[in-house]
Amino acid sequence: MKNDERTPLPDALAQPLERFYAYLHTEKGLSLYTQRNYKQQLETMTQYLVQVGLTHWTQLDSAWVRQLVMQGKRQGMKASSIATRLSSLRSFLDFLILRGELQANPAKGVSAPRKQRTLPKNLDVDEMAQLLEVTDDDPLSIRDRAIMELMYGAGLRLAELVSIDIKDVNLSEGEIRVIGKGNKERKVWFAGQAQEWVGKWLKLRSQLADSAETALFVSKLGTRISHRSVQKRMAEWGQKQAVASHISPHKLRHSFATHMLESSNNLRAVQELLGHENIATTQIYTHLDFQHLAQVYDQAHPRARKKNKDD
């Protein structure tokens, strides 16, 4: 149903919604985008509830809320979209409780359909070695190999990588300070090949970087490299190195996670390395099979092992 086809809501339903929108704006200070999203979700649900007989919010019980879930499934909505709807409804009903207009929140006992978790695609160790066997020695190629070694060697998100400044890197200790999701700071470790190639890049960085630029990785224009540039260059290297599957920054992070868990018995440690808030997010990489996991970072990561001086 399009917005302009919607029938006006009864005052008993519309007025509490308007008070909630004002609350989101004045007291919660949410962005306009988030406010619009709440409004769209709530008004879509309320239109449906009116059609099936709701006239006042005090009528709403868990059976009505389950109807909303079933309606979403009939419409072919993703489980995550239904969960977003339910979250919006819970927030609104909590507001009504806060105002003394409801006694309990009927949406709190209703769950969205379980989201089907698909296993992330990753490269195996041989494919990673093939991708990273970059022999070109120009500054851009060395930068690109340093980026790929670091993303795979530390399991970084793309946003984390491009936001790294020179001051965040302790090369000798193999440590980097990154800002992850939710603006949370964490320390990541890198060793072996990643440490070696970041060091090579740092020696050449001044050939490309503007004098005032603080970013670790810069573009050929001398400024901080963009997300899109990293994605494009990785895809190009995948083709050049004849790797069968499409290469993306996310795939390198997935490969880091999978390879670490295949060689390590420490799910919590890998959770910390990835910056996952919830361990369930990390568990997806285990294929629900923990029997073959063994031990942690320097011993586990195939490119973190230091070369023997006699090699």
UniProtKB/Swiss-Prot annotation:
GO terms for cellular component: cytoplasm; Holliday junction resolvase complex. It comes from the Bacteria. Residues 11-97 form the Core-binding (CB) domain. Residues 118-298 form the Tyr recombinase domain. Keywords: Cell cycle, Cell division, Chromosome partition, Cytoplasm, DNA integration, DNA recombination, DNA-binding. Pfam families: Phage_int_SAM_1, Phage_integrase. The active site is at R157, K181, H250, R253, H276, Y285 (o-(3'-phospho-dna)-tyrosine intermediate). GO terms for biological process: cell division; chromosome segregation; DNA recombination; DNA transposition; resolution of DNA recombination intermediates. Gene3D superfamilies: 1.10.150.130, Intergrase catalytic core. GO terms for molecular function: DNA binding; tyrosine-based site-specific recombinase activity. InterPro entries: CB, DNA_brk_join_enz, Integrase-like_cat_sf, Integrase_catalytic, Integrase_recombinase_N, Integrase_SAM-like_N, Recomb_XerC, Tyrosine_recombinase_XerC/XerD. Its main location: cytoplasm. It is found in: Cytoplasm. HAMAP family: Recomb_XerC_XerD (MF_01808). Forms a cyclic heterotetrameric complex composed of two molecules of XerC and two molecules of XerD. Site-specific tyrosine recombinase, which acts by catalyzing the cutting and rejoining of the recombining DNA molecules. The XerC-XerD complex is essential to convert dimers of the bacterial chromosome into monomers to permit their segregation at cell division. It also contributes to the segregational stability of plasmids. During infection by the bacteriophage CTX-phi, it is required by the bacteriophage, which uses host XerC and XerD proteins to integrate the bacterial genome. Belongs to the 'phage' integrase family. XerC subfamily. This is Tyrosine recombinase XerC. It comes from Vibrio cholerae serotype O1 (strain ATCC 39315 / El Tor Inaba N16961).
